[in-house]
Amino acid sequence: MSFDYTDPTFRNYPFPHYCDFDRHQHCDHDLRTNPPPTEPPSRKSKLMSTSENKGKQPLHPPPTEGFPKPPPPPSSTPTTPTPPDQTKAPEPIEKRIIHAFHAEPKTHTNGEAPPAFNPNNMNAVPLNLLNINLKYSPVTNSIANPKQTEAIGKAWVRILQIDPANVFLYAIDLARACADAGSSPEADIIGANEDLNPVVERNALAGVVRDFCPLRAFCAYYSRVVWNLMIKADQPPANWMKSGIDEGAKFAAFDFFHGVLSPASLYVPLERHPTAAERIANQAMFAVKIANAPGNGSELTMDHVAFTKGRITADSKPRPTPFNT
């Protein structure tokens, strides 16, 4: 069986056949009951726009006077003839192809236009994100936020009688000392900065900080400043050798290094960006410290019941922090 693909009445959907109905709206042809004519029509259509013309409609189909259409059923109501100048133009062939092979797009509104954006509606659809008047500041649990640091500064002034004009200097001095000694909950921050007036022990400063947020989160907020101080003075963390980090990555040997590249930390331009070796070394340092952390009197590295089976030993004691060993 062969088909004349250039014939204007040929249709390839849903199966090859000849049909005069537009867009198959009333098409009920079946090859099993109504086989196509064995001889193609003698009238040839115009050439198509491409050489590979199988199964495609011509851009400008020829008139079909030689193929009579069935007469319309008689209507009981009289119809008014349409003037010649008001006759509807035929639908372009490109649009017919799109309608035949592509379904109309549907949305969650079932084709209806989405409503105007209303912030009072939890299901509002913002068509243009630039029109949303919303400002966002990055925040994370591992880094203190500006409100917490402001509250800590006011507490220093109220409790430790610190000069309000120097609260930032005390904060940077404490964070720089924690880069050497660690910022874990059990870390003992020793010493004081003799250049600041009044002279306040860093351990007292850290005690006030822990009432508002973890000391590590506080130091991570100022990590970019601490990083610049170490790079500019060429002074890596004091315990970099103890951490087992290679000399080429020694500046990353502090436990709040994650705040250096975080958008939630206090932004200052960096003297230089951390290298890939420094980032990997810091992650390796964390993994080693956690793996070597002693358990509750056992040799297990985790307290999960799947490992401990609910057992404890007689010599159980508080676990020291991984960065205070």
Swiss-Prot record:
Residues 59-84 have a biased composition (Pro residues). The keyword Nucleotide-binding does not apply. One of its GO terms (cellular component) is helical viral capsid. GO terms for molecular function: structural molecule activity. It is found in: Virion. Keywords: Capsid protein, Helical capsid protein, Ribonucleoprotein, Virion. Required for genome encapsidation. Forms ribonucleoprotein complexes along with TGB1 helicase and viral RNA. This is Capsid protein.
